[in-house]
């Protein structure tokens, strides 16, 4: 009988025994059935294997004494390995190809054949045995009969899970089938394990042979069960909670269980205290929610253990949360260790009695920065930190849960600050004691609490005493020195007591601690305590609900499962590791199927090896009309295919002629003496020196710089010269006989010196621009030359082609299914079969969409994986040749476009932006019928141009029209531009507000480290430019916005407390790795991105402190202490890093994610930015003494706006002349300060003076450096 399941989690058991000789590999596969049940397949007959490469100079098949030579190698290996020798009767001798190098040999003139190499494939019981083999063979070995030879062990880093998947062609996440029952377990069929013998808590468990597991083609949504969770913790001192402090308890844990793709949701709140439960549905202001199951516990230890028990009972396949890898999981682990209940806490996952493992993974890459993850590896459960997923896939200003929820869902959670949570906890644990009789020491005194009246010495008091533990509010509670007798001072009388009665049972109370114990045992939580706990409980549950909703909204499960299927990589590996492992697994799978060994050890990366990046054209800044974007489709993957660039096709054999190869040769000259930019810079420097000599010369006559007509050098020339002696000095070196040029100028010639000075200014600016563009890293390599075989097709090109073809086919499937769905939906009377088909298609479309996206990502990542120094399969020649061909291709396209009547306004990497002025009329009015006709004409022309140019390139390199026309396109510099988009019929792409949607790259609008105020001012300027408003209107708008920033301080009593206003001024920046909580601020020698040796703290390069500084720069001139040295290094890190350290030192919590939000304050002097920035929460708390530095925000706008003005307005001069002292903060403050000293009328008068006098001055000043017309070029 056949069964099917969706395999989602794999586990290898190699490390479950410490005895190496008894260690055996076993694999467990966890899957989900159609009806949501969990199955575990236990595979005991799989053996991990490695390849041992033998010297190719020996004929190993040749027999000696009746046995092949290779048998002697096996005998030797068995001898040296002893009990850890390979599995008997499983060793294979085989000839295979190598991944690295073409390895072609000439068999006859002009005929070459790819060479195979001899390998022993050895199977072992455990990977530990493989490590032993690797250790034994790390050096040359002396084999009897062969002498000293080198036996190289290959593919030791391949996991058994990957080996099983490629051997049986199984998806690491996907539907698989397996056979059960039949002829019984001895034949390898799956044998159902009895309940009492089961290793796991899965619904079904089978022991099965790997030979009866196979992949099946099935597209059914998987009903995976997910648990979203969150914790709430307390801090005794109000600072960021330290888990090692006993009082900082975890007092609430929310868990939301849901099934992907269904409406099922079950909410749990595990809590200390007694939260007020629901009164309305689903959540009211005071209760936890009617649909929330509240589980109450007396101690934190019980709470933590219950959290693990809940997982064991509910059996989720996935657990997820927000920032759980960096906070929640770590905090719970530390608390469990503190309470000595760690084993109970780690009892998670599907195995009955096996503990989860604490894991910490840290790695870094250029794409993702530093990744530091701490989680519990629970077998059968995938642990997903959703914040980490969002950080890697989406660029947002902030990664707080609230911000992300607003961005994706449009919803938010209750705004409950950490300190409010701490207050709620303190209130939430308060108890009161009711109906207790207090017996005094004196017999003539009776006090009864909890009744309508009190008898004291036979006197009645209508107002009863409050409960005992509150008696301090009306009387004074004191105790004797021995702390055994209590005295209550009530209305001037002192009463003593020591006995409490509860339920007619007396309890003797002698100390305060005994009373507290009594209160905890028999007291009840106050109503305010219940409300406080409920308030936090609601907040805690909301967090988990938002995580669940974001998980569903982003289709996280489908994304991971489809990427896993494409890359043959387990889901958890994809989540916690980078691109390299996915790349390696794809290559290994192909190599396994084509008898090739991934011998990456044969290639060593030169640490100094570097290569150039993509080609980017210098644009002509300005506002353009009707720009057509033409892009290469998947340029780098296509180049690898077209030029057959691969490890296996790389040619380093001179015997192979160039005719058989794709030859690529070029020079790399970057910032060296051969670089055209450097040559031009040096020429400018020489010319500037000559010009400065002329300008600074004191004599009237001097040698000129320009070539005039030739003239005879004779004394007739000097007849009318006043200063003949000066002339003679210049004539000494002139050769009269050769008629040398006489080039002497009178400096008093009108305008001559002014022209020289202008020339000096222009050349200085040009040299400055060149210097900015020059790379700081010099590269001077002549005659790079690499060759790749034209045939046969390489491994890497084949893999990429397969991925691109698969994506194309999948997208075709999507298109066909959508068409079919549309037809079905149009039917008025739908049959049951139609409804079933509609449901099936709707379920299938998201799967196919995520699948085609996984193909795209995988294909595009192939190139990057080859160009790393430390990686799975590095190979620099592929990366270098790919970027070279990319540079060459975009230059060729620009030339073809010019030949076809186009004008390239900008080019970058794989894109060209071009105008066809002869095809359309650029002056037609937007939105008219004529505009629509012109755009349709341009659209069709662009398609034809793309097809024509594509024919000039090798297959599959294709130039594509982006199906968009940028009818307004403002280009500023390289990688900085903005545009409005329209479609084929001239329909303008609009945003949610009904305005033309602005696309942008590289400018303020697209960079996350600019505040909203700056983006609004900038966008306002660009919108007006695109709307063709006048210069006056544009400049007026800029000045108005800037003045409004200051006048805001007047309009509101305390503008800094205005939430909406303050949000406009918040800056966010990313914080890289500097050591975090374990930071020592001690630099270590490492490598930068270019492979150069640099001193680093985390990811940041820092200078090394000198002995002189250490000796003299301490307090009072004394030598620096260790803390002062650390602070010295801290000051060399970016300001946002310094702010984060400052926040932590204050004991406050850091924001979630790698980005930090702050505002810039005015400290009253010119200080470092690190001294001026403050966290938003800290600023709000201290807004009475802290003020915003408005000047900072304006200064940050000057350069970007000036860049726009120079690009749009004619002859716009330098920015420092546009923005004069009228914008100086001190000048404005001199007016603002009068608000508190004079009447409102005086203030309004001064403000009017500022607006009516200062602003026109500013406008005129800007006008003097620009012409009023907008110029469309």
From Swiss-Prot:
One of its GO terms (molecular function) is nucleotide binding. It catalyses: DNA(n) + a 2'-deoxyribonucleoside 5'-triphosphate = DNA(n+1) + diphosphate. The keyword Heme does not apply. Residues 679-837 form a coiled coil. It comes from the Viruses. Its EC number is 2.7.7.7. The keyword Nucleotidyltransferase applies. Keywords: Coiled coil, DNA replication, DNA-binding, DNA-directed DNA polymerase, Nucleotidyltransferase, Transferase, Viral DNA replication. PANTHER family: DNA POLYMERASE CATALYTIC SUBUNIT, DNA POLYMERASE DELTA CATALYTIC SUBUNIT. DNA-directed DNA polymerase involved in viral DNA replication. Belongs to the DNA polymerase type-B family. This is DNA polymerase 037L. It comes from Invertebrate iridescent virus 6.
């Amino acid at each position: 009988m056949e069964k099917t399941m969706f395999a989602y989690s794999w586990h290898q058991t190699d490390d479950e025994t410490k005895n190496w000789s008894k260690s055996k590999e076993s694999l467990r596969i966890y899957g989900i059935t159609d009806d949501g049940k969990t199955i575990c397949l236990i595979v005991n007959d799989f053996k991990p294997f490695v390849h041992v490469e033998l010297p190719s100079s020996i004929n190993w098949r040749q027999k000696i004494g009746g046995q092949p030579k290779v048998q002697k190698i096996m005998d030797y290996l068995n001898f040296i390995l002893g009990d850890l020798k390979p599995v008997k009767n499983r060793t294979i001798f085989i000839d295979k190809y190598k991944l690295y190098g073409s390895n072609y040999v000439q068999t006859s003139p002009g005929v070459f054949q790819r060479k195979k190499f001899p390998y022993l494939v050895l199977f072992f019981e455990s990977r530990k045995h493989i490590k032993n083999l690797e250790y034994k063979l790390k050096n040359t070995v002396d084999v009897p009969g062969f002498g000293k030879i080198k036996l190289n062990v290959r593919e030791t880093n391949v996991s058994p899970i990957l080996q099983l998947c490629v051997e049986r062609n199984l998806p690491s996440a996907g539907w698989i089938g397996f056979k059960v029952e039949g002829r019984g377990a001895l034949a390898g069929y799956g044998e159902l394990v009895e309940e009492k013998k089961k290793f796991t808590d899965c619904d079904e468990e089978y022991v099965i042979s790997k030979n009866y597991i196979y992949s099946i083609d099935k597209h059914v949504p998987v009903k995976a069960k997910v648990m979203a969770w969150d914790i709430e913790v307390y801090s005794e001192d109000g600072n960021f909670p330290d888990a090692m402090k006993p009082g900082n308890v975890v007092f609430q844990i929310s868990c939301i269980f849901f099934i992907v793709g269904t409406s099922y949701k079950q909410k749990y709140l595990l809590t200390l205290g007694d939260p007020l439960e629901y009164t309305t549905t689903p959540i009211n202001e005071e209760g936890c929610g009617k649909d929330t199951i509240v589980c109450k516990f007396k101690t934190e230890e019980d709470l933590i253990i219950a959290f693990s028990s809940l997982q064991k009972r509910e059996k989720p396949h996935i657990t997820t949360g927000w920032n759980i890898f960096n906070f929640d999981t770590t905090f719970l682990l530390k608390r469990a260790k503190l309470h000595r209940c760690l084993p109970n806490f780690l009892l998670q996952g599907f195995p009955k009695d096996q503990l989860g493992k604490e894991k910490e993974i840290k790695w870094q890459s250029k794409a993702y920065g530093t990744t530091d993850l701490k989680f519990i590896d629970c077998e059968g459960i995938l642990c997903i930190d959703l914040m980490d997923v969002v950080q890697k896939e989406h660029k947002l200003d902030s990664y707080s849960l609230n911000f992300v929820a607003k961005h994706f869902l449009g919803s938010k959670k209750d705004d409950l600050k950490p300190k409010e949570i701490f207050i709620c906890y303190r209130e939430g644990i308060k108890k009161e004691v009711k109906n207790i009789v207090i017996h005094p020491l004196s017999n003539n005194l009776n006090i009864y609490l909890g009744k309508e009246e009190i008898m004291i010495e036979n006197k009645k008091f209508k107002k009863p005493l409050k409960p005992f533990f509150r008696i301090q509010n009306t009387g004074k509670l004191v105790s004797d020195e021995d702390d055994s007798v209590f005295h209550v001072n009530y209305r001037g009388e002192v009463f003593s007591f020591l006995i409490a009665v509860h339920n007619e049972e007396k309890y003797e109370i002698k100390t305060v601690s005994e009373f507290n114990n009594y209160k905890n045992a028999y007291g009840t939580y106050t109503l305010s305590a219940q409300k406080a706990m409920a308030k936090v409980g609601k907040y805690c549950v909301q967090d988990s609900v938002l995580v669940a909703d974001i998980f569903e909204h982003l289709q996280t499960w489908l994304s991971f499962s489809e990427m896993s299927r494409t890359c043959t990589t387990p889901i958890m590996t994809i989540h916690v590791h980078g691109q390299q492992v996915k790349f390696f697994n794809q290559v290994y799978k192909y190599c396994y199927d084509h008898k090739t060994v991934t011998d990456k050890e044969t290639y060593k990366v030169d640490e100094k090896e570097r290569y150039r990046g993509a080609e980017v054209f210098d644009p002509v800044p300005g506002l353009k009309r009707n720009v057509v974007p033409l892009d290469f489709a998947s340029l780098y993957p296509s180049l690898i295919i077209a030029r057959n660039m691969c490890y296996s096709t790389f040619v380093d054999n001179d015997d192979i002629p160039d005719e058989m190869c794709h030859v690529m040769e070029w020079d790399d000259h970057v910032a060296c003496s051969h670089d055209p930019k450097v040559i031009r810079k040096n020429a400018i420097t020489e010319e500037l020196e000559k010009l400065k000599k002329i300008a600074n010369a004191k004599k009237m006559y001097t040698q000129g710089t320009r070539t005039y007509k030739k003239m005879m050098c004779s004394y007739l020339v000097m007849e009318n010269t006043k200063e003949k002696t000066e002339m003679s000095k210049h004539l000494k070196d002139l050769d009269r006989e050769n008629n040398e040029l006489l080039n002497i100028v009178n400096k008093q010639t009108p305008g001559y010196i002014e022209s020289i000075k202008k020339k000096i200014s222009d050349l200085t600016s040009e040299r400055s621009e060149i210097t900015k563009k020059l790379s700081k890293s010099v590269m001077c390599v002549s005659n790079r030359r690499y060759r790749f075989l034209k045939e046969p097709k390489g491994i890497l090109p084949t893999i990429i082609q397969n991925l691109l073809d698969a994506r194309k086919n999948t997208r075709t499937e999507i298109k066909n299914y959508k068409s079919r769905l549309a037809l079905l939906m149009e039917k008025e009377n739908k049959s049951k079969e139609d409804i079933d088909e509609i449901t099936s298609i709707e379920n299938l479309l998201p799967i196919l969409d995520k699948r085609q996206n996984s193909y795209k990502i995988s294909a595009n990542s192939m190139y990057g994986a080859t160009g790393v120094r430390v990686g799975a399969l590095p190979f620099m020649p592929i990366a270098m040749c790919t970027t070279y061909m990319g540079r060459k291709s975009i230059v060729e396209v620009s030339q073809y476009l010019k030949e076809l009547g186009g004008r390239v306004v900008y080019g970058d990497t794989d894109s060209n932006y071009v105008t066809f002025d002869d095809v359309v009329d650029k002056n037609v009015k937007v939105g008219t019928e004529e505009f629509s006709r012109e755009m349709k004409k341009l659209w069709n022309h662009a398609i034809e141009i793309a097809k024509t140019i594509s024919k000039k390139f090798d297959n599959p390199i294709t130039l594509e029209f982006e199906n968009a026309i940028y009818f307004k396109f403002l280009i500023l510099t390289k990688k900085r531009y903005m545009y409005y988009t329209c479609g084929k019929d001239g329909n303008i792409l609009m945003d949610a507000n009904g305005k033309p949607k602005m696309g942008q790259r590289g400018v303020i609008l697209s960079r996350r480290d600019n505040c909203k105020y700056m983006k609004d001012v900038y966008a306002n300027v660009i919108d007006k430019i695109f709307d063709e408003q006048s210069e006056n209107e544009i400049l007026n708008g800029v000045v108005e916005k800037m003045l409004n920033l200051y006048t805001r301080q007047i309009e509101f009593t305390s503008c800094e407390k205005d939430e909406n206003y303050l949000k406009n001024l918040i800056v966010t920046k990313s914080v890289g790795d500097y050591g975090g909580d374990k930071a020592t601020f001690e630099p270590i020698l490492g490598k930068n991105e270019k492979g150069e040796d640099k001193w680093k703290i985390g990811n940041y390069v820092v200078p090394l402190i000198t002995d002189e500084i250490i000796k003299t720069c301490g307090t009072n001139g004394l030598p620096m202490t260790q803390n002062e040295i650390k602070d010295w290094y801290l000051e060399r890190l970016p300001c946002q890093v310094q702010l984060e350290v400052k926040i932590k030192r204050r004991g406050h919590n850091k924001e979630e994610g790698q980005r930090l939000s702050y505002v810039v304050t005015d400290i009253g002097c010119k200080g470092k930015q690190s001294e001026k920035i403050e966290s938003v929460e800290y600023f709000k708390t201290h807004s009475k003494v802290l003020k915003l530095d408005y000047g900072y925000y304006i200064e940050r706008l000057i350069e970007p706006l000036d860049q726009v003005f120079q690009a749009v307005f004619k002859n716009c001069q330098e920015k420092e002349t546009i923005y004069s002292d009228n914008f100086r903060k001190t000048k404005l403050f001199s007016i603002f300060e009068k608000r508190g000293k004079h009447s409102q009328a005086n203030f309004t008068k001064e403000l009017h003076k500022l607006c009516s006098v200062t602003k026109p001055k500013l406008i005129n000043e800007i006008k003097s450096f620009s012409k009023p017309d907008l110029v469309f070029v």
